[in-house]
Amino acid sequence: MEQIQVELGVRSYPIFIGQNLLENSDYFSSYLQGKKILIVTNDTIAPLYLAKVQALLASYQCADPVILPDGEQYKTLSQMDAIFTSLLAQNMGRDSVLIALGGGVIGDMTGFAAACYQRGVDFIQIPTTLLSQVDSSVGGKTAVNHPMGKNMIGAFYQPKMVAIDTACLHTLPAREFAAGMAEVIKYGIIWDGSFFSWLEQNVAALKSLDEAALTYAIAKCCQIKADVVAQDETEQGVRALLNLGHTFGHAIEAEMGYGVWLHGEAVAAGTVLAAQTASKMGLVDQSIVCRIEAIFEAFDLPTEAPEAMDFEQFIKHMRRDKKVLNGKLRLVLPKAIGQAEVYGEVSESLLQEVISRA
């Protein structure tokens, strides 16, 4: 079992990583004693893990769970209302704990509900997808989508702990696993070139769900994320680097319809577009772009924008990106494998050239 600490002063919290973590209630006891618990999950995860978690927490006060429909298209304010209704109907107060049992959508919605309910109650993340284990469950970003943009309504609100059971990945569909790998690869590109090289050398081990390889990769990603969040919790500086590929990627998700492209698929294509932009600007050699494309392809991820999207469809969403400052687009672009930077002087004509050739 690995343990990583997210250092945020009095709001610091642990990330536990290990196989069959959901068979040991000791990890949870100090966060649940004397609390009333509401588990929030979805209709895909509930048949797989809800009974297991309920059995794990049998000695605590558990309310009736909330089971939401599965999918990015349901990450909305109207669906989040079901969480609030359940909390109120079961007379749950400020001593409540919400448990997010699921992937990134469930984690984001549960965290946002916890931030809002009675002006803030505790919550715990139990991420069940690779993407949520390496990225969205750590760092306190919570949100729902709006038809005009992804994650536009939300808050920074940290969990009390994160419990990552690698055994959950054995029930994850291959497409979802690949989508999670997009975020894993991102860490290598922006932060750690040696980790990127390790990923290139361990494609087969990761795709076969080798336990040692998985644990190493997840722990490496969580440690990088914890270090970045400790430096810049609310994304005023270095944390923006974690958005590599996301400006293009969020545009793909919003334009194609939430859930048509998985988040990780959109990030993969978006990262290649970012790398091609960096190459056009003379920031990286074309050989770097080729390495980035090759590793995404090795994990069965898209490396091109949707044929159905043109420049105007991209740019209308990109102009709403949360990194826009004084009306100017700001893009995270790679400078090398293991290094990235935020650039605020990227011309739309250059972006049009990159997108048109994609």
From Swiss-Prot:
Binds 1 divalent metal cation per subunit. Can use either Co(2+) or Zn(2+). It catalyses: 7-phospho-2-dehydro-3-deoxy-D-arabino-heptonate = 3-dehydroquinate + phosphate. Coiled coil: none annotated. Its cofactor is Co(2+); Zn(2+); NAD(+). NAD(+) binds at residues 70-75, 104-108, 128-129, 141, 150, 168-171. Its main location: cytoplasm. One of its GO terms (biological process) is chorismate biosynthetic process. The keyword Coiled coil does not apply. One of its GO terms (cellular component) is cytoplasm. Keywords: Amino-acid biosynthesis, Aromatic amino acid biosynthesis, Cobalt, Cytoplasm, Lyase, Metal-binding, NAD, Nucleotide-binding, Zinc. Pathway: Metabolic intermediate biosynthesis; chorismate biosynthesis; chorismate from D-erythrose 4-phosphate and phosphoenolpyruvate: step 2/7. SUPFAM superfamilies: Dehydroquinate synthase-like. CDD domains: DHQS. Catalyzes the conversion of 3-deoxy-D-arabino-heptulosonate 7-phosphate (DAHP) to dehydroquinate (DHQ). PANTHER family: 3-DEHYDROQUINATE SYNTHASE, 3-DEHYDROQUINATE SYNTHASE, CHLOROPLASTIC. This is 3-dehydroquinate synthase. It comes from Shewanella loihica (strain ATCC BAA-1088 / PV-4).
